[in-house]
Amino acid sequence: MIRVVRVLAAVVGLLLLTGCGADALPPAAHPAAPHEATQASPEPPTPPPEATTRRTFAPMRGGKPVLGGISYGPFRAGQKPGGPDPTPEQILEDLRILAPRWGMIRLYSSRGPSETILRTLQDESIPIQVMLGAWIAADDDEANATEVAEAIRLANSYPDQVLAVSVGNETQVSWSGHRSDRDRLIAHIKTVRASVKQPITTADDYNFWNKAESHEVADVVDFLLLHAYAMWNQQQLEDAVPWTARTIESIRKEHPGLPIVMGETGWATELNPEGDEVKYIKAPAGESEQARFFSEWTEWAADAAQPYFYFEAFDEPWKGSDDPREVEKHWGLYNEDRTPKQALKGVAP
């Protein structure tokens, strides 16, 4: 997902962020920043060597495979990364709301409320697994080292809860506001992978994964975590899921043999008609539009057996500009007050 300016971009102790992707953007689930699609590498890629040691991303719940997960940003009105944090009681409420429908959630940082979330899942025996994040900033080696160390500690301390670890979020795509050195990212990925038993990945936009240079990164991960937003890429609603399916297939051809998990996709329910987002979003936002996209996406994903994390669980009012219509605030399937939007009303888990 050029992005709406992030006011809180440099806050330390960040957790999630919102995938819907800015300069040291706080680790919250966030839509990928918009960018014009560019061509994939012209030459057919050489398939990677047989990865006999590749770890399998295989979420299970009650002995059955789990296909769909959701990005979880826990911050409510008056809360934000860096504090104040949600209370343990609020986190428990959220997890109880999510558990009937989703068997896995995605976090974007190893700090902030992340351990509270993992501990709550463990102590309350809530059957949700977590893709844990390690937020990698562009020019903060100390913070990055802390994120990596905490991700390793949490993955080893909560092995039943941590399903996988994603090291970095949208750090390589050309439009990223927190673009990181590729060699350092690869080193962080290798450090985490050598220290935990879970499968390891990094998340990025399709406009990185479709480039030849992405193979350097793809070679060191266990699976590819892909972001693709039809809404941010000037698609109309009727073509949103077909566009997303075509995008996934193009990345599959670029990286044959590497499993793909959809890390972020979604549809916003409000936008600021006077904001920068209208340069990239050409389709209407709204609850009925989100409901249609969510229904069509989940149906397609089930038919295609495509694992995914939908973006996102709850609206997050702290994000983006001060304008309450700011699109970054309105990607949740639930309102900030935890009431379901139209996409979930009357729909069985």
PLM features: what roles do these ranges have?
Residues 192-210, 258-266, 307-316:
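Aromatic-lined carbohydrate-recognition surfaces of secreted/lumenal glycan-active proteins
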Residues 22-32, 40, 44-64, 77-82, ...:
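Aromatic-rich peripheral "rim/lid" segments of glycoside hydrolase catalytic domains that contact
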Residues 59-65, 95-99, 115-127, 150-162, ...:
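Acidic (Asp/Glu)-rich catalytic clusters
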Residues 65-146:
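N-terminal carbohydrate-binding/catalytic regions of secreted carbohydrate-active enzymes
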Residues 173, 177, 228-232, 256-290, ...:
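Active-site clefts of carbohydrate-active enzymes
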Residues 132, 163, 169, 204-246, ...:
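Aromatic- and acid-rich polysaccharide-binding/catalytic face
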Residues 18-19:
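C-terminal motif of bacterial Sec signal peptides marking the signal peptidase cleavage site
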Residues 82, 116-201:
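Substrate-binding cleft of extracellular glycoside hydrolase catalytic domains
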